[in-house]
UniProtKB/Swiss-Prot annotation:
UniProt source species: Cyanothece sp. (strain PCC 7425 / ATCC 29141)
Name of protein: Deoxyhypusine synthase-like protein
GO MF assignments: deoxyhypusine synthase activity
Listed transmembrane segments: none
Assigned EC number: 2.5.-.-
């Protein structure tokens, strides 16, 4: 049979006692429902298996909906997500739940002027009091004045410390499993923010800087740590089996790029051998034809070295609302996958960075030695014009 045909569509009535697995396997037959089925199958059968390091990027207002707690935290506790790159806004709104604050389901057709007069905030069809922001801000500022925050650090360490305080707030309120930050802290899952100033957390960090706070969030640490995680994903815990790297992308935006740029950072900038992520899975509503990164497809990422060209068959993009897809794929995966041992990548960061630095400096020394040897063996050049090179030392073709 032609490879164009996957399986025959054989519709049957949906029974009244159907499970989520049967619903997806047998009734998500075409269009984006079929893409969502393919994502569920790829996650369950290949991605969330031993030997694969799974990075999640998170954009859009996901945590205000409760999905940080209901859909993502269970995946973290099951060892199915190893590191996260999120907008700061998602982590800020996650704190509302850790602090026991109330958000309400409403509808989008409300009078926003009246909401402003009543000191209420709207995120599409979610409504909450302005005091939720003020009390969360007060919590953040109180926490960030503590001694552990008075130094330079990356956002993984910053969010780990913040998660520790969020967990303490949960305990004080007699709550559990009410915060993605607290869950990541407990499970040793590092959380990065690609643009830490672009959120209310970053705004409060900036305010404290005016008071003389010594806290500085260093993006260079984040770039190198995430690159190290992606690079050492090749080291599998399974004997005689090479590890793999997966990118699970919810939405798009800056977190998507920060997750994918780990690969160019390795081969383009650091000059180390790398082939790209092995798996690429995205839930998005962004179109590819406008040129934005949010809608860029996996095959385009191949041209940048972000995705392994041999792994294109293991890439899926589903064009739908993430609040529809995320609960479905979480339910499917938790049903079909056994929990994995926690990698606790947060604790392994220093060792990975030390080894990445050693390999980078070794590669630099080798390139410089080869360049020197080549120069000694070459006849005296007629021109002394400098040759333009990439940071890793590779000459740029056609450039002087």
């Amino acid at each position: 049979m032609s490879q164009l045909f996957s399986h025959k569509i054989a519709p049957s009535p949906i029974p009244d006692n159907i499970s989520v697995v049967d619903l997806i396997d047998n009734y998500f037959t075409a269009y984006n429902s079929a893409r969502l089925r393919e994502i569920c199958h790829l996650l369950a059968q290949k991605v969330m298996q031993p030997g694969v390091t799974v990075g999640l990027s998170l954009s859009g207002a996901m945590t205000p909906t409760g999905l940080g707690i209901s859909a993502l935290a269970p995946l973290v506790r099951a060892g199915l997500i190893d590191y996260i790159i999120s907008t700061g806004a998602n982590l800020y709104h996650d704190l509302h739940y850790a602090l026991g604050m109330d958000l309400y389901a409403s509808h989008p057709f409300v009078d926003d002027v009246k909401l402003r007069q009543e000191s209420r905030i709207r995120i599409y069809d979610i409504i909450f009091d302005y005091d939720v922001l003020l009390e969360t801000d007060a919590f953040i500022r109180e926490v960030l004045r503590a001694e552990p925050f008075q130094r330079r650090m990356g956002t993984a360490e910053f969010h780990h410390l913040l998660g520790q305080y969020a967990r303490a707030a949960e305990v004080e309120l007699g709550r559990s499993h009410s915060s993605l930050l607290a869950t990541a802290y407990e499970c040793g899952v590092p959380i990065y923010t690609s643009s830490p100033g672009d959120s209310s957390i970053g705004m409060n960090v900036a305010a404290l800087a005016l008071e003389g706070s010594q806290l500085v969030l260093d993006p260079a640490l984040d770039v190198n740590e995430t690159a190290a995680i992606a690079y050492f994903a090749r080291e599998s815990d399974i004997p005689d089996q090479e590890g793999k790297s997966a990118a699970l992308i919810i939405g798009g935006g800056s977190p998507k790029n920060f997750l994918l740029q780990t690969q160019p950072q390795i081969h383009e900038v650091l000059g180390l051998e790398e082939r790209g992520h092995d798996y690429f899975i995205q839930i998005t509503d962004a179109r590819p034809d406008t040129g934005g990164l949010s809608g860029a497809v996996p095959s385009e990422a191949v041209s940048w070295g972000k995705v392994d060209p041999n792994g294109l068959r293991d890439t899926v993009v589903c064009y739908t609302d993430s609040t529809i897809a995320l609960p479905i794929l979480t339910a499917y995966v938790l049903n079909q996958c056994a929990p994995r041992p926690l990698k606790r990548l947060y604790d392994r960061r220093p060792a990975m960075i030390e080894e990445l630095q050693r390999l980078y400096l070794q590669a630099q020394f080798k390139q410089q030695a080869e360049a020197k040897l080549g120069k000694e063996q070459m006849p005296e050049p007629q021109s002394t014009e400098p040759v333009a090179t990439y940071p890793c030392g590779t000459p740029i073709k056609g450039r002087k």
